[in-house]
């Protein structure tokens, strides 16, 4: 029976987290539906306003940069109707994420060392050496425990059948975890009944685990380790997150100008004099980290940092060179990596992907571009994506020209209808499409 609250709710166009296609409430959504029904739309809208006020008071924000490079600060949007994932589903997702990240770490270490996966013709070496994220200076080196990506953000979607699919791997500098943690705190404040009625899995331990992860990455044992979060600065879009994580872990938030290198050791400038730094959680891309080794124009990095890391005098997470696993061309081979390195079948499937540098697949993409989603292989944050069914003919032709000019830099995928969940709008509750970014911390079990 569809109640008054849900009478206008239409779940027929995608897999919905609350309702089946014939508008029957899913079992795991029964309790929350009863709570929402009892409150009614007016009360829910009041809670929503309280939620936004709390977000403003806590200073939760992010920056968006326009085409003219002007930054606009925005409040973090949070809808109070939660996405519910039953524990049985999450257990499978969790195992699949761990499996995937483990294989990716093994792959990165193999690429920079033995290169077995190339010799066995599982992954073509050309796609790695042509990746802008391949760092030749990392050749012959492994970080402690061979853990290259200590913090991984894996983007998941649910398709029309309700299956979880991996959409993207983010292994360089994955962002967004602070908003997840703050969302949970805000929801506990403004909607405590949800947490008394459901046995909600805790995420409060994340920053403790991140702290422990940093300690484990210190190359040499020390009684009193000093660790820092390295930020590009206050104008970075994720600066709120950088400061939040540093505060929660009780460690210093620093910019490149706060650090210096002497005798291949990293030091932090303090009022009491130089302080040796043992581990750095960096939130800068590789190219900006060290102007001596990489981009000479960088003014936000630390000259000499790479050499310190290679010599085992400082831990850096995520490790330099990890970006090769972010490449969307490499993404298409991850299922093969899982079989190759772990001898297991992938627990989580991924979206079918066409590689434009392979002629047969490129021809298919060009012929069917109006049906496909085309993505730059090495962009992030949704930049440069073309959704074929929605793009005008002129834009599609421009993308075709770009593919022909530089096929290695593009992949294409079928248009997946993302799952939906109820969202409070100005006048009603309506389904909205969504994805999910879980975070995986890799410790010594890698």
Pin down the residues of each PLM region.
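Preference for protein termini
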Residues: 1-444
């Amino acid at each position: 029976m569809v109640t008054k609250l849900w009478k206008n709710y239409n779940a027929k166009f995608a897999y919905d987290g609350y309702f089946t296609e014939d508008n029957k409430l899913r079992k795991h959504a029964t309790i929350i539906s009863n709570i929402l029904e009892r409150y009614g739309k007016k009360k829910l809208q009041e809670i929503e306003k309280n939620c936004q006020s709390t977000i403003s008071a806590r200073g939760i924000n992010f920056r968006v940069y326009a085409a003219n490079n002007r930054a606009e600060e925005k409040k973090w949007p949070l809808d109070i109707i939660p996405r519910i994932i039953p524990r049985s589903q999450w257990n499978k997702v969790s195992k699949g994420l761990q499996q995937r990240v483990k294989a990716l770490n093994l792959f990165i270490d193999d690429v920079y060392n033995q290169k077995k996966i190339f010799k066995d013709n599982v992954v073509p070496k050309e796609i790695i050496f042509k990746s802008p994220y391949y760092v030749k200076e990392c050749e012959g080196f492994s970080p402690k425990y061979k853990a290259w990506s200590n913090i991984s953000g894996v983007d998941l979607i649910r398709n029309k059948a309700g299956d979880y699919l991996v959409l993207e791997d983010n292994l360089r500098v994955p962002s967004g975890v602070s908003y997840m943690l703050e969302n949970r705190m805000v929801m506990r404040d403004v909607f405590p009944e949800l947490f008394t009625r459901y046995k909600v899995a805790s995420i409060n331990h994340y920053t403790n685990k991140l702290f422990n992860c940093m300690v484990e990455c210190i190359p040499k044992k020390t009684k009193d380790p000093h660790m820092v979060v390295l930020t590009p600065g206050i104008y970075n879009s994720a600066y709120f997150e950088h400061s939040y994580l540093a505060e929660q872990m009780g460690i210093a938030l620093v910019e490149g100008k706060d650090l210096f290198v002497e005798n291949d050791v990293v030091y932090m400038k303090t009022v009491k004099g130089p302080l040796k730094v043992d581990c750095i959680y960096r939130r800068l891309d590789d190219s900006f980290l060290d102007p001596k080794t990489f981009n000479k124009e960088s003014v936000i990095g630390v000259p000499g940092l790479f050499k310190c890391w290679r010599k085992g005098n400082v831990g850096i997470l995520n490790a330099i060179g990890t970006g090769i696993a972010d490449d969307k061309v490499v993404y298409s081979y991850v299922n093969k990596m899982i079989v190759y390195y772990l001898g297991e079948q992938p627990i989580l499937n991924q979206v079918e992907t066409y590689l434009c540098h392979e002629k047969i697949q490129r021809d298919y993409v060009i012929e069917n571009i109006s049906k496909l989603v085309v993505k730059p292989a090495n962009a992030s944050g949704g930049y440069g994506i073309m959704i074929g069914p929605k793009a005008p003919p002129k834009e599609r032709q421009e993308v075709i020209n770009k593919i022909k000019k530089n096929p290695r830099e593009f992949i294409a995928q079928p248009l997946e209808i993302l799952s939906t969940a109820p969202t409070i709008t100005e006048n009603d509750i309506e389904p909205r499409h969504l994805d999910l970014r879980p975070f995986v911390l890799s410790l010594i079990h890698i």
